Amino acid sequence: MIDSTQFPVLEQRIWLNHAAISPWPATVISAMRAFVEDNAAYGPLHYSAWLETEQRLRQSACRLLGANADDLALVKNTSDGLCLIAAGLDWRPGDAVVCSEGEFPSNLMPWQQLPPEFVERRMVPFDPHDPEGALIAALDSKARVVAVSSVRYDSGIRLDLQRLGAACRANGTLLVIDAIQHLGAMALDVSELQADFIVGGSHKWLLAPEGLALFWSRPEARDRLKPIQTGWRMWPDMFNFERRNWRPPSNARRFEPGTLNTAGIVGLEAALELLLRDDAVERERRLLERSGRLLHGLSTLPKVHVHTPVDDARRAGIVCFRVDGVAPQAIHKALIEAGIYSAIRGPSLRLSPHFYTPHAQLDRALEVLADALQTL
């Protein structure tokens, strides 16, 4: 089990905002500090060591996802990966992209930039009781892409990816998954999903710095994407600067045109090394236990309406709620004054512990919330 001393934030505040940005663990801080000091003293003289760290990251990311290295790329962020798909796919006149209403902007804007006279943007209502049903009902011969968040940022509802993937595959529709609220929180094995593209950034549940994301693509789907950027680093012999017979590689490195975020790579490699010390299913169990503890506590408070399902299969690490007659800003302020950090999303307050959050901190948050509701 991962030692709690890896998380210095526990000694300073109650952090229930991992769904936004996570504080770095000690091992990430140490790795980043060593990289900065090495770079300051030696510049690029240890570049080969940087490449070794990058290779370890790729191996760890493959373990995290159950993926093949040829199918995994390192991109700048979740938006970057989604834009690579939206801009690079070989769209045909009359194609449609299907999304649920209320998606995070990263999974809306790339599709909205497609010419409407060429690609139909099909927005379907989000049904919290059957989120896959409306998407599946929207499938027809024109539905080229279904783009979803595997865990909703504004409610914590987790989609049944197996059910949705099977329906998309049967219809010949590509399934694109924004997994930023999933990776590091819930177990995910690409071999068990009928997905085509999965992308998720590093700075939330993966406990790493901003500026990097994992981008997985199924080979048959990847072949349909034209690289929208090219550069020296996408070739297997990338240090052959005199090469002129450029052809995009068939593997996912075709999406890595130029210099990568080395500092981010160092941080994410350290974070994944830490996360992979524990079994992914065990980490998921511990996180569900913690989000469930919050759900139970909230259910005992008057005027509180929880938007997150109780069913383990339908939730992850996010718990969202609202209080009758009380603005979320007021609750948010009361929690901050007690050293408890959460987030406001729409009309709701969002709490997002991680697998390492102590039960005592969750109970303290519920206690502060109960006291605040008596005066607000």
Protein language model features and the residues they cover:
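Pyridoxal 5′-phosphate
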Residues: 1-376
